[in-house]
Amino acid sequence: MSKAVISEKAEPRELKALYIVGPEIEPDPEILKLYDRKDCLVVGDGIDDADIYAIYLELKKHNVQIGPNTRIDIAAHGKRVDKKHYLRLSTEEVTETKKFLQQLQGSSPIDPIYVHLWSCYGGTANKDIAFLNPGSIIVTHVKSQYSSFGPADNFAHLHSITRYINEKNLTPHLQYLYDQLENYQATTFNQKESDGRIVKFKTTRTPEHDSMANIISNILEQKQSEELLKEFQNYLNKEAENFSKLFGEYLASEDKEKFQHYTSNISDKDLKNYVTGLLLNIANLSNKNNIKDKEKILTILNKIVNILGTSLLAVTVRNNNVELTKALLNKGADQHAKYTKIDMSLLYIACLNKSVDIAKLLLEYNVDPNYPTTDNDTPLLQACEKKSPELVKALLAKNADPNKVSDRGLSPLIVSCINPSEESREIALNLLANKNIKVNILGPNDFTPLILACYNNSERVVQALLDKEADVNAKDKDGFTPLFAAYRNHSTKITELLLEKGANPDVINPKTKSSILYNACNEGDLNIIKLLLKHKANPNLTTFDGTTPLMAACEKGDLEIAALLLKNGADINKSNNNGDNALFLACKNGNLELVKMLVENGVDLKKGSRGMIASSIAKKNGYEKVGAFLKAEIKSQRTLNTNQSNNPLPPKPPRLIKNTTTQNEENKKTWIKSEANLTLSQPHYNFLQSNSEAKSRALREINPLIEAAIKEVDKVNTVNVAVREEVQNILSKELLRIPINNLVDNKKGIINQITKELKLNNSQDNNNREYKISQQSLKEIGNKIFAAYGHKIQPQLTNTTTHRWQNYIKTTNNTNANKSNYLGKR
């Protein structure tokens, strides 16, 4: 997946509607059509899980967030245990509804959330409203003692959501009033038989839901009476009154007129004035960055505390009113006050708002920098989530704990490594500068900071983590290591950093059972391949179906990668579970040069797959030249075998081993047999080696000679990678004509002459000192080296070998013309 460095995304957009669908739930296609908009999102599809982590990933993927105006509909199987409601959001377990809703509001813990719950026994969740932010709404659609009826729920959901999505400027608080009648009308269709009677499922918003359902039912059955209609009006008035108490503070000023319209029938005029006048007035005053009305605000402070459960200081902090906050603190306001029932500190609210000035002001008054919310979120965690390096520095300077983990499984370092923005990278570096930081702390799904930093291609953060000795081989919940994360971005630099710190290059993808080397070969990432092989990656590890990296390279037709793998010990004749080997796969794409290279390195030409050999599959796929080449090679091998069978040879000479003794006077290596005194002056000579084997061994001698020469040239001029590879490829082919024993005995002279010729033929640009050379020049160099060292030298035979040769002549009546059969063809 090469990828560009991930840039910082724009600020997340607020969703208008979020639809959470649990397992085994079939959402109505008409409902899904309504959600098919940029400002709406569906998580889960009745098959996949829709738990809080799945929601988090989807929100991050689409760069959206839950806000105070987001309507959240949850359709999931539910159950009631010990008077608590549970949702089935994943295939493996159930989640307590209260905790799930608290996690949903975690992205902005001071804002209300608006939830419709479509679940069996949903009425049990009504009391969970007490644990949510002030102003939150939970609308349940089934009584606590009844199971749900899917089609009717879909009908009610469709009616309810249509207005909310299609109507502009409709806040949750106004939608709440619209829902009173609309949802009750819809739920009259929600019927099923139970114990021989018809059970009507009802919306369980208020204690009056039973009487309300009867009212709606009678109206629909045309059994209206004056008393019934009055009862209906009273119900709506009471709902409006409840609405005023709960949500008056949260109405924006532009909603005031609409709000007054919907509350016009409230009988308690004083209550109406209090809600629509006093609270809105206080909110407006606290929003203005001045202190003209300070005394008036302080006078009514107790009333605000009694009704909202909070203090005016909390309101001014929330509204980022620096001047009024200073005035209240100087007046003696309690800097340790908390915000409502969720027990948020004022410092936490300041961090939520990225209010650096207010946060510093509170820290000067010695507020606790580590005071957590009920979910164990700390101010430092929020500062990291809001991507504010300045806030983080201020908190760390006051000894904020960098290792505190919230109930969401998040720590400051995890959060800063999750986010790819430059601000978050700066925060991560600030945290890593803290001597108490835990670099291997775990986040959701057992992600470590290093894994996350590698996923986000954060090179500086990765380096800082490695300097702090972060675990380079740590695995997440699914078994992936930092090296996998780095490879996902094809990040050569981060991959190199990890390997140099001891990352295991042979880790296996737990899902595909493939190595990173295999993946790199399959995707043609040459730089990563070179790094992995440099750090001793195993080139013969297979995937679940037995495929090796070499097979992947050959199937892609990549000659350069295949040659590199063979040079590093790849098994050329290994087959996968289908019987295919590297040659067979190379023949499928018709790369003649690749096929020739495999043959030169000793691939088995007769090894087949599914009843066919490589030459046959090449012809079948229309690659006549490849097929003809392989057929000629097979014929050549048969001729060699026939000659050998007509001229039976003596037993193959015993294996030679290297003597560690050095003759100082000649500085030559002596080779001896472990059981007899057979000595040869050409240690690598093999009497019976085939043509392809000879070439393979010769390449192993040639390549180091060329590399040594290039290094000498490199001291004077810069030889770039492309030129280096061209020199290697062309000269290797030219020097293959030289007998292997000549190569072995004349290494130093050959290196010196190659170096000299390369320097002479260089067409260097003096301005940039870059080495350049033409293909023709390389071929001419090869001819010169061959002229100097390519003459044929017969092996010098010892007495024992000569004796065997004489016996061979006597028994076969062969002439010297057959001597090459005995010695082996070059």
Swiss-Prot record:
- InterPro entries according to UniProt: Ankyrin_rpt, Ankyrin_rpt-contain_sf
SMART domains named in the record: ANK
Keywords from the named record: ANK repeat, Repeat
* Coiled coil segments of this chain: none
What stretches of residues are ANK repeats? 308-337, 342-371, 375-404, 445-474, 478-507, 512-541, 545-574, 578-607
| Protein name (record) | Putative ankyrin repeat protein RBE_0220
Q: Name one Pfam family in it.
A: Ank_2
Signal peptide extent: none
Q: Does the keyword Repeat apply?
A: yes
What Gene3D superfamilies does the entry give?
A: Ankyrin repeat-containing domain
